[in-house]
């Protein structure tokens, strides 16, 4: 029986989605990215070999899987070429396996320059963007002045539109941010070269997905970042510029919401965050340092050290509400091995002393909440590489059961290490 499955992060990103997508794609015929850009970083470890992907869907390493980049993704041709070259050097035939929407907005050099200039200008108030042009590209899309992949099919018209955009953004770069101007001729030449590579892969994605659905194929939708970074539902303004939630599938891939059968929420056994923004359960102590070191918590995209903290059931419940999550995949359980006790945030105390089980809507209010914790015993046994649920320590099983009780959602998959083999699957999202 065919199943259409969404896999997304339920925290602030970096939950371990790449491994799980790769693990589950043996049951899918198609993997689709529907939002974000190359600001995502999905790390795969297969038979000890590490692969980091930023733009191309994680299913690209599977021989019989077609990978798709939907219209909700802002596409950097330069980043795509680099990633294709890296994969093709390892004998992965990317051009044969990858298809790209004609409606993808393009990230061009002036978007990157603007992103970085703005972050410098903000100083201590910097949002913590990756500086890769994601936000400015989405701005051009919403302002209806952006260039899209489909525009590359008519280079004369493309050049005319590009000249207007270069002039428009150079004014801000030079006059306001005192940065260097972007050279039109250089960008145009690059785009002409990119066009020749991209054209064979460009397709009508909604039609492609609809045909696959009608043929009974199983489709996986791969989310980037996490629910709490969603432009509408995240800790605004410390968010990304796209809809990282399940609703992004309909708008970012052109796939009807009624056709989705299962939503898998990836949640780390603790919490991390990269960059600025509120983080109620953050740990500035030895435990936090331990989690960061043992969990190798450095951003796959930026290399920045991730902030670490206890798991937050309040934030998870919001993710459940927004995404209609069917089941959780709990990752990095093994990182908690050896801790004497664990804490779960079950509520927030507000500045007026009242208690809430719902996250605030503004970052300012989020910054001042105090987490209310429930303490549970840890375990001393190693869980690394365990593949049977019954082999987990009793304390680990109790921890998992408490997460399920607090969120009302079952933990269907448990990850006990970076390799795809180091996993416990209790209920398969594809029903197989």
Swiss-Prot record:
* Chief location of this protein within or outside the cell: cytoplasm
Quick one: which residues bind GTP? 13-19, 41-43, 306, 332-334, 415-417
List ligand-binding residues for IMP: 14-17, 39-42, 130, 144, 225, 240, 304
Question: Mind listing the GO biological process terms from this record?
Answer: 'de novo' AMP biosynthetic process; IMP metabolic process
MF terms per GO, please? adenylosuccinate synthase activity; GTP binding; magnesium ion binding
Cofactor binding remark: Binds 1 Mg(2+) ion per subunit.
A GO cellular component term found in this entry reads:
cytoplasm
Q: What is this protein called?
A: Adenylosuccinate synthetase
């Amino acid at each position: 029986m065919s199943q259409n499955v969404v896999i997304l992060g339920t925290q602030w990103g970096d939950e371990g989605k790449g491994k799980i997508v790769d693990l589950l794609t043996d049951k899918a015929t198609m993997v689709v990215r529907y939002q974000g850009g190359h600001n995502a970083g999905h790390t795969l470890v297969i038979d000890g070999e590490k692969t980091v992907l930023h733009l191309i869907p994680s299913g690209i390493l599977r021989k019989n899987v077609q990978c798709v980049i939907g219209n909700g993704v802002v596409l950097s041709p330069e980043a795509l070429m680099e990633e294709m070259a890296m994969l093709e050097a390892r004998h992965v035939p990317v051009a044969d396996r990858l298809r790209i929407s004609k409606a993808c907005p393009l990230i061009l050099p002036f978007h990157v320059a603007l992103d970085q200039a703005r972050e410098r200008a903000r100083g201590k108030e910097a949002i913590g963007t990756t500086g890769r042009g994601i936000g400015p590209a989405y701005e051009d899309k919403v302002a209806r002045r952006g260039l899209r992949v489909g525009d590359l099919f008519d280079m004369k018209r493309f050049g005319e539109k590009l000249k207007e955009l270069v002039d428009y953004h150079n004014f801000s770069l030079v006059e306001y941010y005192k940065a260097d101007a972007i050279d039109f001729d250089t960008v145009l030449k690059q785009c002409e070269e990119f066009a020749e590579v991209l054209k064979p892969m460009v397709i009508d994605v909604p039609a492609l997905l609809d045909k696959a659905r009608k043929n009974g194929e199983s489709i996986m939708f791969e989310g980037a970042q996490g629910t709490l970074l969603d432009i509408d539902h995240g800790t605004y303004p410390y968010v990304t510029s796209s809809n990282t939630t399940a609703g992004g599938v309909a708008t970012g891939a052109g796939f009807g919401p009624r056709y989705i059968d299962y939503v898998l929420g990836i949640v780390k056994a603790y919490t991390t965050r990269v960059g600025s923004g509120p983080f109620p359960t953050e740990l500035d102590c030895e435990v936090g340092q331990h989690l960061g070191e043992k969990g190798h918590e450095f951003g796959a995209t930026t290399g920045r050290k991730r902030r670490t903290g206890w798991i937050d059931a309040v934030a998870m419940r919001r993710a459940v509400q927004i995404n209609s999550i069917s089941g959780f995949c709990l990752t990095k359980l093994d990182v908690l091995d050896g801790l004497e006790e664990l804490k779960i945030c079950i509520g927030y105390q507000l500045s007026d002393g009242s208690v809430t089980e719902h996250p605030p809507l503004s970052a300012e209010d989020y910054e001042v909440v105090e987490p209310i914790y429930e303490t549970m015993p840890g375990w001393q046994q190693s869980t690394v590489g365990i593949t049977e649920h019954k082999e987990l320590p009793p304390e680990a099983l109790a921890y998992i059961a408490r997460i399920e009780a607090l969120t009302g959602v079952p933990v269907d998959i448990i990850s006990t290490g970076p390799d795809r083999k180091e996993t416990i699957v209790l209920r398969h999202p594809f029903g197989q």
